[in-house]
Amino acid sequence: KTLFPYTTLFRSKTTVLRLISGLETPKSGEIKNTFRKTGFLFQENRLLENLTAMQNIAIFMDEPNEHEIIALAEKIGLSSGDLNKYPTELSGGMAKRVAFLRLLLCGCDLALLDEPFVGLDRDLRNILATMLVEKIEQQGMACILVTHDRFEAARLSREIMQLSPKGMDVQNVITLPTPLSERNSAFEETIVAREFQGIHYYE
């Protein structure tokens, strides 16, 4: 699923993910998360500064495998040397990639992603998105993604929930049955033109 806020200043989007993860408690009502393990990719990365990149990725793995980490890291432009660096030695883009790998390899069956590809170039975004799709389709990982990018929502979502500009109400739900692995840029453009026509952001 994808949460698509109508506003670029939508602060409640992160609150939704924090409530689902159990990091915050609702003031009323109840949220039941019945998944075995929930992973959270924060917008600000949240790497542990006293651990190397390699250790940050391995810390939540059920069975840490350095060879697997190195192989996946190389796909997204991280060398073995980069994996031995501490977070303060990494650029913002490198830290985001480390945080992404940590989520991908943590063994969660529910992944919560808050604007995961912001600040990354198009080629890298495509690589990470492909890796995420493979994880979803091959291993059955459930995913809730927050994004303001309409094309990203069209590529990665089976269901898009458009959120109201002044709260957490769902204004519209778009269902996309086409398998994620069969989607391409033409599909994304068609969905954006059809489903997001006339949508304006509120400041």
Model-based region annotation:
Residues 2-9:
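Short, small-residue-biased leader/transition segments that mark boundaries at the very start
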Residues 21:
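Helix-to-loop junction immediately C-terminal to a conserved catalytic motif
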Residues 66-82:
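Conserved ABC ATPase "signature" region
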Residues 86-90, 94:
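Conserved ABC ATPase signature
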Residues 99-100:
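Hydrophobic anchor residue at the start of the ABC signature
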Residues 111-115:
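Catalytic Walker B motif of ABC-type/P-loop ATPase nucleotide-binding domains
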Residues 125-139:
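Helical segment within the ABC ATPase nucleotide-binding domain
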Residues 166-195:
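Conserved beta-strand-loop-alpha-helix hinge in the C-terminal portion
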